[in-house]
Amino acid sequence: MDRGKPGSKMHVLSDANGLPLRVALSAANIHDSLALKSMLSHFHMGHESHAADSKPARLHADKAYDIPHLRRWLWGKRIGIRISRKGIDSSERLGRRRWVIERTMSWLTGYRRLNHRYERKPGNYLAFLGLASALCCYKRFLKLTM
């Protein structure tokens, strides 16, 4: 919240098909990279025999996440990264993968309660974000079973 105005950012971690795996919410004046560790730390990254089923194999992100300590942290967790480097790579090369998360964000903001933040309390907005994510997964499940 900035001067009493309800401004927030949605952080969405999705799979390769665009299904939202984890959603989070932060203030609008917080840098995007600060939310990544908390989102990934909730995945179980324990024993090697279970690691293939419980952690992302590769992470695609834009230039906002190009921070050396974040790259080292992901490398330490053995998560493959494809982060566009500041000043070197253009964002155009991420287009092959970026449309997946852009489509997911479009699905989520298609819900009226998420397109414009009507809720004053962040917890209420996060609840609607979780509900919209569950509905996206449910709709995808229906398409696969019909």
Tell what function each PLM region has.
Residues 68-73, 77-81, 91-93, 97-146:
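Basic, amphipathic alpha-helical segments enriched in Lys/Arg and hydrophobic/aromatic residues
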Residues 1-86, 93, 132, 146:
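Polybasic low-complexity intrinsically disordered regions
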